[in-house]
């Protein structure tokens, strides 16, 4: 039976054709534009009812939270992980870092949040996929080639960087 991947989170998950990129697996894309961590947590029971026994679960959430200057979502993120681990005991759970975004009021918020996400990953024994440095240009700002004009959503090239990182660092361990 083909491996099963569950991708959950915000528009950064939703807007890519993961199934086309990974044709040898069954991909369940439950990304939702505008999603916050709280929104994902509220949708999670329905997702768990619909997707049984995935081999891999990848989460990208929090970008919309920090864009609204909501930094309390990390507690919600821990609840998401706990629920996934309870229902998908055999799955490899991958927490992605947030990506660099150029919103003037954020300052160093994304790197600070990413350090907290990495701590959560370590304490919950999940895989942390640090995409942040891969999306920086030589000027240590978001590499414009990887983004759409809005500076938040990814271009085809940006999604390819993400997919290659997943292939290189996570998929080999699935066997």
Task: Please give the residue ranges for each predicted region.
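Alpha-helical cap/lid subdomain in secreted, periplasmic
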Residues: 20-22, 26, 42-175
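Serine-esterase "nucleophile elbow" of acetyl-processing enzymes
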Residues: 1-53
């Amino acid at each position: 039976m083909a491996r099963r991947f569950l991708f959950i989170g915000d528009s950064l998950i939703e807007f890519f054709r993961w199934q086309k990129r990974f044709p040898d697996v069954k991909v369940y894309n439950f990304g939702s534009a505008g999603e916050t961590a709280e929104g994902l947590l509220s949708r999670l029971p329905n997702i768990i009812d619909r997707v049984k026994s995935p081999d891999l679960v990848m989460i990208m959430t929090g970008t919309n939270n920090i864009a609204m200057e909501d930094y309390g979502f990390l507690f919600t993120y821990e609840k998401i992980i706990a629920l996934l681990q309870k229902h998908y005991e055999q799955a490899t759970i991958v927490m992605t870092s947030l990506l660099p975004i150029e919103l003037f009021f954020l300052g160093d918020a994304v790197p600070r949040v990413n350090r907290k996400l990495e701590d959560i990953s370590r304490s919950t024994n999940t895989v942390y996929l640090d995409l942040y440095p891969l999306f920086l240009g030589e000027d240590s700002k978001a590499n414009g080639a990887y983004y759409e004009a809005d500076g938040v959503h990814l271009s085809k090239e940006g999604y390819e960087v993400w997919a290659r990182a997943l292939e290189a660092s996570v998929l080999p361990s699935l066997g």
